[in-house]
Amino acid sequence: MLGIVVSHADAASMHIGEHLRSLRDWETSVDETRPDDEGGGTVYQIDSVELREFEALHLDIENVAAAFDDPDLLVFASKHAGETDELLTAHHTGNFGVAEHGGEDGQFARACPGAHKAVVSALQRHAPPDYEVGMECTHHGPTAVGVPSMFVEVGSAEPQWEDPDAAEAAARAILDLADEPADRPRENGTRRHLLGVGGGHYAPRFERVVRETDWAVGHIAANWSLDALAEWADSDEERDTVLDRAFRASAADYALMEGDRPDLTAAIESLGYRVVSETFVQEATGVNLGLVEALEDAIRPVDEGLRFGALAPGYDGEWTVLDLPKELISDVRGVDSEALRDTIERQSIAYATEQNGTVVTGPIVCPATTELEAVVDPLVEILKQRFDSVERNADELVARETAFDPDLARTADIPEGPKFGKLASGESVEIDGEEIDPERFQRERIRRYTL
């Protein structure tokens, strides 16, 4: 069940609450077991959604889930204050350092990465034309909620807090979360959740990940949050304890880091978590995490050049590694590197690359049922653009070409220079009154590739 918290101490929260109630036909009941200012009194319910109102400012309310009837997710309707003009935003709550605005020092509410991803998308769908949609780093309280939670906010000043279109957009986005799970599905013993580390308060890099990949982001420690942690923590051990809490409160085993922080990377890895790149996140999108792990073990890590082919998304069958001759891959790449990549990507689950993923080298991973010919034959067609003939004999490819032999030309005392170059490109030249035919200096070359 989705629980919605509306605070009487926040005008924007009340405004969003008004639109929440107007958008649906709610059933009302009276809860006499709690004071009216603590979520009792009139309770609004529809299907799997329950709305309650509280007198206190929501960032100061602790254990608010206890007021609701067994919620799975809580959303705080709220204002956003800042110098960001028209903005709809969503974020998780907690404190990496001293709790200056609710909650406890170095503590975090349980994040809801999956629902947060969904609400960012919903805010984008419903946003008025003049409003930006964004996400923020983790900040303020509460830190003890009882279930996964987040704030959904309208900002950034009084004109926006009173804007009915903005309040309605936030209300619609919140209602879209009915039956939305707090977390991404579990796979391979983990989830597609990231702890965000570094960057600015409004976290554009992590927002890009949320929008463009199938990963979700839990708590985010912005640069200022890391400074607050360093100032508050008395030791590396205390710092690591807070980081571990942030991972646990995000249900995350992975961190995505903004900037180069070797000491922090080492600390995170010592806790048993993995720091990944945005390349990893993009490449692993749509690919079963168990398959990602297996192929990284078998070939190489994504950050060292593993790339996933067109067959990878959703693939859960057996696979095999084809280790084609390096000379074959190199020669095909020399003929047409784009055609090589397109061919390998189309035929493969994964393949190895070098130079930051720009140069395909192999090996190649294909479904176990793949016939060798299915991979090799398209490469032969590319080779034919250079060679006069390419034939397959048993387990061998034989490529033949007739080409200019510079050593042969030198033995005939052809001087280096422009005329030498013309001969190399197949043009006749005149030397000492004699016309020299380039065919005199051509030889058949044979390339053999053992499959």
UniProtKB/Swiss-Prot annotation:
**Which GO molecular function annotation, any one, does this entry have?**
zinc ion binding
Q: What is its EC number?
A: 3.1.1.96
Reading the lineage from the top rank, the first entry is Archaea
Q: Which biological processes are named by the entry's GO terms? A: D-amino acid catabolic process
What does the cofactor section's free text say about binding?
Binds 2 Zn(2+) ions per subunit.
Its top-level enzyme class, in one word, is: hydrolase
List the catalysed reactions. Answer: a D-aminoacyl-tRNA + H2O = a tRNA + a D-alpha-amino acid + H(+); glycyl-tRNA(Ala) + H2O = tRNA(Ala) + glycine + H(+)
Region annotation Disordered: residue ranges?
Answer: 410-437
Q: Which cofactor does it need?
A: Zn(2+)
One Pfam short name: tRNA_deacylase
Task: Give the UniProt keywords, A-Z.
Answer: Hydrolase, Metal-binding, Zinc
Provide the assembly information.
Answer: Monomer.
What the protein does comes down to:
D-aminoacyl-tRNA deacylase with broad substrate specificity. By recycling D-aminoacyl-tRNA to D-amino acids and free tRNA molecules, this enzyme counteracts the toxicity associated with the formation of D-aminoacyl-tRNA entities in vivo.
Q: Which family does it belong to?
A: Belongs to the DtdA deacylase family.
Supply the HAMAP family for this chain: Deacylase_DtdA
The record's annotation in PANTHER family points to: D-AMINOACYL-TRNA DEACYLASE
| Protein name as catalogued | D-aminoacyl-tRNA deacylase
- Organism phylogeny: Archaea, Methanobacteriati, Methanobacteriota, Stenosarchaea group, Halobacteria
Recorded name of the encoding gene: dtdA
